[in-house]
């Protein structure tokens, strides 16, 4: 085993980018395990393998570190979803994709979702932050889908895209809040189908809820897009689950 001084020299030689990455990874673990209030900078430093002063070299305080962790989470979701979304066609499928991936992110990372809802979003400086802009980009994908659907004649022209966005994400937050409190569970696919059918039925000309088979096809297209993105395969144009 190398002497302790050698390990210390090795840590000191790490480039700043690597140190920041290690600190943020450790901070994410501690925030997820303990929440924001009970997370200590000393715990994060210990887990990252750095001295406490190194954290303050890159981050002003614990709150800034939390914001950076959640920013990174949003950036990852936007990047990953963009690769898969390129393969999705048809307004019903696109709306469902956005709803399903959002529900999946909440189900997969409930602690980060709670931190966003409880610690970051209520802050008075949130609306002027980079994270606010990331969240706007994340939710405005639905606005873009609705606008495109109106332009193509799929969706009613009197539809308010921003109202649809608020209805969908407000509905998701309300329906998943019990889960985030540790009270029960939910199925992202089933909930995505239910919300998508309800919303699209109200927006489309003569729109009707998707049949069970159409829902299955939509899930298969979403799964295929994920696999192709993971394998680096250029997405092929899929068959829409609903005729357009």
For the regions a language model picked out, list residue spans one by one.
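Helix-turn-helix
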Residues: 22, 30-64, 68
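Short hydrophobic clusters on alpha-helical segments that form packing/core surfaces
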Residues: 23-31, 102, 199
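Amphipathic alpha-helical packing segments from all-alpha helical-bundle domains
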Residues: 126-152, 161-177, 190-193, 197
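Conserved hydrophobic residue
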Residues: 37, 155-156, 184
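C-terminal peripheral helix-coil segments that are non-catalytic and often amphipathic
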Residues: 1-7, 140, 144-152, 185-244
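Hydrophobic alpha-helical connector segments
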Residues: 68, 82-112, 168, 192
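Short, basic, alpha-helical segments at the C-terminal edge of helix-turn-helix-like DNA-binding modules
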Residues: 71-78
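Amphipathic alpha-helical segments used for helix-helix packing
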Residues: 94, 107-126, 143, 177, ...
């Amino acid at each position: 085993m190398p002497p302790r001084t050698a390990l210390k020299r090795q840590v000191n030689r790490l480039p700043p980018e690597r140190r920041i990455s290690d600190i943020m990874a450790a901070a994410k673990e501690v925030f997820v395990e303990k929440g924001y209030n009970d997370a200590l900078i000393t715990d994060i430093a210990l887990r990252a393998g750095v001295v406490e002063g190194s954290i303050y070299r890159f981050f002003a305080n614990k709150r800034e570190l939390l914001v950076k962790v959640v920013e990174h989470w949003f950036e990852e979701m936007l990047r990953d979803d963009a690769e898969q979304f390129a393969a999705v066609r048809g307004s019903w499928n696109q709306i469902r994709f956005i709803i399903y991936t959002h529900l999946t992110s909440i189900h997969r990372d409930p602690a980060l979702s709670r931190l966003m809802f409880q610690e970051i979003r209520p802050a008075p400086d949130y609306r002027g932050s980079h994270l606010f802009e990331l969240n706007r980009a994340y939710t405005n994908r639905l606005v873009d889908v609705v606008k495109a659907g109106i332009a193509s004649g799929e969706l009613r022209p009197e539809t308010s895209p921003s109202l649809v966005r608020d209805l969908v994400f407000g509905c998701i937050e309300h329906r998943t809040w019990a889960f985030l409190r540790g009270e029960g569970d939910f199925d992202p696919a089933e909930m995505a189908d239910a919300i998508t059918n309800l919303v699209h039925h109200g927006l489309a000309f003569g729109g009707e809820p998707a049949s069970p088979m159409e829902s299955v096809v939509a899930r298969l297209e979403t799964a295929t897009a994920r696999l192709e993105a993971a394998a680096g395969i250029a997405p092929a144009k899929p068959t829409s689950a609903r005729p357009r």
